[in-house]
Amino acid sequence: MVSAVSDVRYFWHETPVPAGLEVTQVYGWLLCPRTGRVLVQDDDGTFNLPGGTPEEWDADLTATLVREAFEENQVRVGETAYLGYQEVHRPGRAPYAQARMAGVVEAFAERAPDPDGGRVYRRLMTSLEAAPGVLGWGEPAVLQAGAAARVARARWRLPVDSPSEPGYVD
């Protein structure tokens, strides 16, 4: 799938990141096992998935996601699954990858400032069906949410097809 925002093009792949393609970001579709809802980070009306940049001390993609999810949203992540990657083509730069994972939220801690910038994000919990529209990422987000739903159903048996009503966990 190809999606374009201005001159940037995004290609979604449900395969491992090829050797030599730099991973600049690891974001997660983090699901509550009780409600079947996914966490969408709310920064004063700008929405994103939890995650961030891999650091050299992170052992792997899972370590990046677990660290970033707690720093930004104060959620403890249990089991995770790799979903795929978004290949990004930006003029004047070599293509790079943005990894996407799914994960199970084990606990919500009290909200606190993100150590990188001091922001306190709200935690919107919504359905996988609604999340792509909230994020505003177009068709790649729809495909990613679909991949997350398949994993959530098959591997974790989460109630993603009948989630509870959306709301904030603050």
Identify the residue ranges that each predicted region occupies.
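A short coil-to-beta-strand element that immediately follows conserved catalytic motifs
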Residues: 75-84
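Glycine-aromatic-enriched surface loops/turns that form tight recognition elements
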Residues: 20, 106-111, 145-152
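Acidic, metal-coordinating catalytic segment for phosphate/diphosphate chemistry
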Residues: 1-27
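Active-site beta-strand termini and strand-to-loop segments that position acidic
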Residues: 30-33, 103-105
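Conserved Nudix-box catalytic region and its N-terminal flanking loop in Nudix hydrolases
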Residues: 33-71
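A generic fold-level signal
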Residues: 23, 33, 93-96, 118
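Active-site-adjacent beta-strand/loop module that shapes the phosphate/pyrophosphate-binding cleft
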Residues: 87-111, 124
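Nudix hydrolase/Nudix homology domain
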Residues: 116-170
